Amino acid sequence: MFSTAKNLSVVDPDLWKYVEAERHRQDEHIELIASENYTSPAVMQAQGSQLTNKYAEGYPGKRFYGGCEFVDGVEQLAIDRLKKLFGAEYANVQPHSGSQANQAVYFSVLKPGDTVMGMNLGHGGHLTHGSPANLSGKLFNIVPYGLNDKEEIDYDEMERIALECKPKLLIGGASAYALRFDWARMADIAKKVGAYFMVDMAHYAGLIAAGVYPNPVPHADFVTSTTHKTLRGPRGGLIMAKAEFEKSLNSSVFPSLQGGPLMHVIAAKAVAFLEAAQPEFKAYQEQVLKNADTMAKTLASRGLRIISGGTQSHVFLVDLRPKGLTGKAADAYLGQAHITVNKNAIPNDPESPFVTSGIRIGSPAITTRGFKEAEAAEVANLIADILDNPTDESVIAATKAKVHALTSRFPVYGA
């Protein structure tokens, strides 16, 4: 029998010190990594529940184990909420990650050697959309599309490439593209060449759920996503699709790619989908857009170049070359002041992916804390102060003090 009095701090103090240190870091630092966010206490409560004890291979009503009547209810609730949230015909909430959700789609409609079009990783795409370092780039013939001289997607060029290479699958979505995608145009291109159309909306899912960014579900054959990032749920993945793909996708997830689903994580996904359907979530996402736009414009006013000229989403890239800095260096200097960003390649970057010429900045986490335009502008000015004086210890110390003043005013988790 387990004693509930024996909590983690008692059972494993060595681990607990790291958990507490990370909690303090999240409390005190300004988080600007676009793929990170804070989950609600309800999401964490679901993920830390006794549902973690239950094995449930299969799907609701079709399990390989007994005792699944209650976890069936959990998973069906998550499926129903997800379908309603995005207007989908079919949904699968079992993928453990966005990468596995993408793999499930690939393996349901592609064969090794098939041609796939996805956004160039160096122009803002994602590893799983055909990078040579990823399984997708090793199994399939990848033909990338990218940005034009204005650092916008060139749909005419995309169509020209598609007509030439005749892909089996066209992929939309990105990890570092600030502007809006034209899903309808991409669907039309896919239709012209007889390709399936898949959208990986991982970065934009929360914005889409709130109706402040275009919804790909009516246009795409398949839509995948993570459940964290802007959606503010637990770490995990999901798939939505036309109803005709239900059987092939279900079998592609289980038993082809995964075994038992993580029922405690699926429960947390269900909570996140419920939260995303509330009016306050729409207000949150509207503020995410305002904060990102404010930061981009403020940094531009301080002499920094914003890739694509600005942002229409939660994220944007900053070209550091005018400052004579690399992304790796800027990441480190800002980190000393307790501002967390990530180095990121910019289009046609002369530096390696481990160094880069840019940084990626996102507004989801600071908006969850309650930051509005005034605070977003202050954060951007703090970033610019560091980038203007990266080796000045007095500037770093003064900036860190201002960061702590901000974060103390806006705690992540209140009473």
UniProtKB/Swiss-Prot annotation:
GO BP terms, alphabetized: glycine biosynthetic process from serine; tetrahydrofolate interconversion
Classification via SUPFAM superfamilies: PLP-dependent transferases (SSF53383)
One GO MF term: pyridoxal phosphate binding
Chain positions with N6-(pyridoxal phosphate)lysine modification: 229
Enzyme class: transferase
Cross-referenced InterPro entries: PyrdxlP-dep_Trfase, PyrdxlP-dep_Trfase_major, PyrdxlP-dep_Trfase_small, Ser_HO-MeTrfase, Ser_HO-MeTrfase-like, Ser_HO-MeTrfase_PLP_BS, SHMT-like_dom
Residues flagged as site, Plays an important role in substrate specificity: 228
Gene3D superfamilies: Aspartate Aminotransferase, domain 1 (3.90.1150.10), Type I PLP-dependent aspartate aminotransferase-like (Major domain) (3.40.640.10)
Catalytic activity: (6R)-5,10-methylene-5,6,7,8-tetrahydrofolate + glycine + H2O = (6S)-5,6,7,8-tetrahydrofolate + L-serine
Requisite cofactors: pyridoxal 5'-phosphate
Localization (cell): Cytoplasm
Pathway: One-carbon metabolism; tetrahydrofolate interconversion; Amino-acid biosynthesis; glycine biosynthesis; glycine from L-serine: step 1/1
Keyword rRNA-binding: no
Keywords: Amino-acid biosynthesis, Cytoplasm, One-carbon metabolism, Pyridoxal phosphate, Transferase
Its job: Catalyzes the reversible interconversion of serine and glycine with tetrahydrofolate (THF) serving as the one-carbon carrier. This reaction serves as the major source of one-carbon groups required for the biosynthesis of purines, thymidylate, methionine, and other important biomolecules. Also exhibits THF-independent aldolase activity toward beta-hydroxyamino acids, producing glycine and aldehydes, via a retro-aldol mechanism.
NCBIfam families tied to this protein: PRK00011.1 (NF000586)
Protein name: Serine hydroxymethyltransferase
